[in-house]
Amino acid sequence: MGLQLYQKNLLEKLKESLGAVLPIIGIVLVLCFSIAPIPNSVLMTFVVGAVLLIIGMMFFTLGAEMAMTPMGERIGTKLTNTRKISVVIVLCFILGFIITISEPDLQVLAEQVPSIPNYTLIIAVATGVGIFLVAAVLRMLFGIPLAHMLLILYPIIFILASIVPQDFLTVAFDSGGVTTGPMTVPFIMALGIGFSAVRSDKHAENDSFGLVALCSVGPILAVLLLGLLYHPGGSGYEQTMIVKTDNSVEMWQLFQEGLPYYIKEMLISLLPIILFFFIFQIVSLHLHKKTMVKIIIGIIYTYIGLVLFLTGVNVGFMPAGNYLGQVIAGLSYPWIIVPIGMLIGYFIVKAEPAVYVLTEQVEELTSGAISAKAMGMSLSIGVAFSLGLAMVRVLTGISILWFLLPGYAVALGLTFFVPKIFTAIAFDSGGVASGPMTATFLLPFSMGACEALGGNVVTDAFGVVAMVAMTPLITIQILGLIYQIQEQMKEKQAAKDYTSIKVCIENLDNVDNQEIIEL
């Protein structure tokens, strides 16, 4: 029975992975065989990378369900039950710090800013996440509305953004998405659910989300402050070198070189969380042996999934994305990159590993009121729109602030009109949508296009992650607005039906028995 259930779950996750990745493969293949021919070696590397990505997603989503989510929920619940604010603050800061410092994408971000020592940047960003994870948890425990905190923090961010060097803006805003990776997001979200589960008040459900939203603010503030302190002359960028292979053996060597690197990187990434959990298990949790075995198996699945996923996207997808961007932008009608970017953006967010975790948790926590399908559609529309705007930036060189400032103004304005839970989900969605697929396909695509057009890659191409993180804040809240209007219409209809029934009953009461007999 257990084996059959396991096979069923694995098959279900495989179907989800195929459904998420096949549209991207289809779009790339259509482009390759029509307006954007790419070398066979790059195409074959992309196809092999896609296979690894599908298998990796399958294992990751199953592993996150079995391990990362229950780990986060149990730690959150246990910390809340301690009733000791000092313990909660210290442990949440340590947790936020260690899961950020081990994020592989943070190392890449540090390399983009040579004016600041790598470890200075990494420690500053990790400290930012640690502080804001503490702030997010305290917000939940004391019932402080998320919108109030966001309305204070984002104006501060934009005031700082107006005085830092232009080259620094895109890297700073990208950092918010970079530090909320596929491994940390499910854990942090589950931590929030664990904290809110202990509360029994009516606002507990609304406060289940919002941790990722505030954790994304920390890195942006940290990088902007470092930009002011170090007065950097600009961030660094080296043109992407696309490795071409002459045969299948050379192509296989590319993956052989990439695989050990990601085996090591993901071990470093997962180890701090695993150690934290096992120490917590020994000292406080004392979970049953059967539960621990399931969690350990889930951790192994998560590890295998992330290794395969990251190898596939970095070795296979990154070169293809860069090359496609160069070829399409080099056409006599480069404007076509805007609708193509939107089409890719619409489908690629479905392949983000943490998106499935978010949509399923939202559907479960709202008892189906907010369906996974509606969430997925809203995210896809948001990312499509963001990619269109990002490609406009590549073509025109417009400053990212002209997009981010009105975008966040609209997002913050909507917080006054939509249900609170939608605001929290929306601001969490920004960090979830801007995952590894954005960093390894959309960003190289944007960089390739910028290189072909002769633009400034640092100011015009970087910032894609920030754009992808911004638009779901608007689309998810619009979904909330639609949901609210529908609920109000249902209530009005129910009230109308109740009034009609009441009138009928009163009329019947006025009919005497003789009239009833005659009838």
Language model features by range: what are they?
Residues 1-17, 21, 72-86, 200-211, ...:
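Intrinsically disordered, low-complexity non-transmembrane regions of multi-pass membrane transporters
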Residues 1-90, 94, 272-301, 308, ...:
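N-terminal alpha-helical transmembrane segments of multi-pass membrane transport
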Residues 76-78, 85-156, 334-415:
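Helix-loop-helix junctions within the multi-pass membrane cores of secondary transporters/permeases
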Residues 11-17, 38-48, 80, 113-122, ...:
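Interfacial loop-to-helix junctions that mark the boundaries of transmembrane helices
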Residues 30-44, 64-72, 98-113, 132-144, ...:
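Transmembrane helix-loop junctions in multi-pass membrane proteins
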Residues 3, 136-152, 166-167, 171, ...:
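Juxtamembrane and boundary regions of transmembrane helices in multi-pass small-molecule transporters
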Residues 241-354:
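Transmembrane helical segments that form the transport core of multi-pass membrane transport proteins
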Residues 22-35, 49-59, 91-98, 128-139, ...:
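Hydrophobic core segments of alpha-helical transmembrane domains in multi-pass membrane transport
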